[in-house]
């Protein structure tokens, strides 16, 4: 077994705390640094969108942090993990929070229309990544394409002063993408959480304060 495949501290911690993947701690670090998930009051109108949600760690973190207030929409080609088995699809509730999941291609018109109809959103989070090929050039190009799709969603669905988190594989074109985000948000930064594997080329672009 390679070091990459061996269970590490973050994987073991995720299992213990009921999350399907270690990626939850990346969002936790980002959230703690930028104060992204902060609905107010029992009747909060805070709305969030998780793009590329499966297996569901980021959605679970957001739902727990929202503590029964607000609304979360999530989308992915793959289904969510067994931690969502108790999700009441008729009432659309999860842990007391209004929750909606759509399984499908985020670039498909019907999926896009459904997601946009649930907005506008105060926060969009995305840990979506392409299937890797082993070629850094190809993988980073595909990651860039996905990130651009997420940013297009942000432009269409974010509420004024809304925030965005999107994963990106560092490579050609990523600097230009960050510059683009700086024109769309009051602040846009690159941030690599400690929970990312040391050898990983992934990082996250965080946009704060969407400008219409």
What are these regions (language model features)?
Residues 70, 162:
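Glycine-centered, small-residue-biased loops immediately flanking beta-strands
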Residues 1-41:
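Class I SAM-dependent methyltransferase Rossmann-like catalytic core
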Residues 104, 118-161, 170-175:
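Mobile active-site "lid"/loop adjacent to the S-adenosyl-L-methionine
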Residues 65-66, 153-158, 167, 184:
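Conserved helix-to-beta-strand junction in the class I
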Residues 55-68:
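Conserved SAM-binding loop of SAM-dependent methyltransferases across substrates and taxa
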Residues 42-54:
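Conserved class I S-adenosyl-L-methionine
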